[in-house]
């Protein structure tokens, strides 16, 4: 299910968890009802990759570009759960590159959860153009032509009956 991140919907432990994969460190914390991730700024790193910079050059600078972002949304509730943080433009959402395996109660790096060619460059999944159409109802990706800010809308988070069957009518 796609849901707002709350103590009731976040299934993974966030209490001072430290995760490491492929040279990157992720620090997860919880303070009351707020969940946060400290990581290399995915907006900065995505821009560096998009500009064609060598991964070794990016790696040398990465630690200087750490940010702490709140977890604002979750996807998944049956087998694995993913977590989303705000990006730098409008309502852009980026997924942290870890999934929580619910049955095994453990974290797993996203790049190890899917088949990819060896030495594939790091990439960043965005909700707004990648997951929105299947994991929401009435999802409409959008962007301001003047500010280039992401302006995504959804009638409802999650996959409701109307997502597949069209506009709802009174149930009989």
Residue ranges and their predicted role:
Residues 4-25, 32:
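A domain-level signal for the mature, folded cores of soluble proteins
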Residues 22-172:
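Extended surface/linker regions that mediate inter-domain or inter-protein docking
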Residues 1:
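Mature N-terminal segment immediately following signal peptide/propeptide cleavage
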